[in-house]
Amino acid sequence: MAEPATDTILVLNGPNLNMLGTREPEKYGHATLADVEALCRETAASFGLKADCRQSNREGELIDFIHEAHARKMKGIIINAGGYSHTSIALHDALLAVQIPTVEVHVTNIHARESFRHHSYTARAAFASLCGFGIEGYRLAIQGLAAKLGLKPKA
């Protein structure tokens, strides 16, 4: 049985997000995935939470992480499914199956990009979606999730 993590949120990053900092910096900026994870841990801690940060380029592994979040009774999920946002009904279904409050994040404004990026399956399984704020969107997502959970910043 998985060890409970009731004070933890899952921060899930999908394909190619391991390339942040070097991948198309004119679109994604120069911050790395390590920078994103540090930002998430810091923001989560300000609400008395831990951030379990995961990244995978494989759809099935992302689904396994979502199922693990359910088994461990995590409080919430922040997800940037990358390109899978626009194609993966399986990720959508996994998020709905676990019924964990979820916020979708995209570093860029997906609605100002190619038309195939305008639709997001993962957004339909989330209570909120943020895009276009750069990596700051992760901080905003955690703050929004904390508000949804009724958590206040710790002094």
UniProtKB/Swiss-Prot annotation:
Q: Which Pfam families match?
A: DHquinase_II
This enzyme catalyses: 3-dehydroquinate = 3-dehydroshikimate + H2O
Give the annotated active site.
28, 106
Q: In which pathway does it act?
A: Metabolic intermediate biosynthesis; chorismate biosynthesis; chorismate from D-erythrose 4-phosphate and phosphoenolpyruvate: step 3/7
Biological process per Gene Ontology, one example term: chorismate biosynthetic process
Q: Which residues bind substrate?
A: 80, 86, 93, 107-108, 117
User: Which InterPro entries has this protein been placed in?
Assistant: DHquinase_II, DHquinase_II_CS, DHquinase_II_sf
Q: Where is this site: Transition state stabilizer?
A: 23
Which PROSITE patterns does its entry note? Answer: DEHYDROQUINASE_II
The molecular function terms of the Gene Ontology recorded here are: 3-dehydroquinate dehydratase activity
Q: Which UniProt keywords apply?
A: Amino-acid biosynthesis, Aromatic amino acid biosynthesis, Lyase
Q: What is its EC number?
A: 4.2.1.10
- Biological function: Catalyzes a trans-dehydration via an enolate intermediate.
**What family does the database annotate?**
Belongs to the type-II 3-dehydroquinase family.
Q: How does it assemble?
A: Homododecamer.
Q: What is this protein called?
A: 3-dehydroquinate dehydratase 1
Q: What organism is listed for this UniProt entry?
A: Bradyrhizobium diazoefficiens (strain JCM 10833 / BCRC 13528 / IAM 13628 / NBRC 14792 / USDA 110)
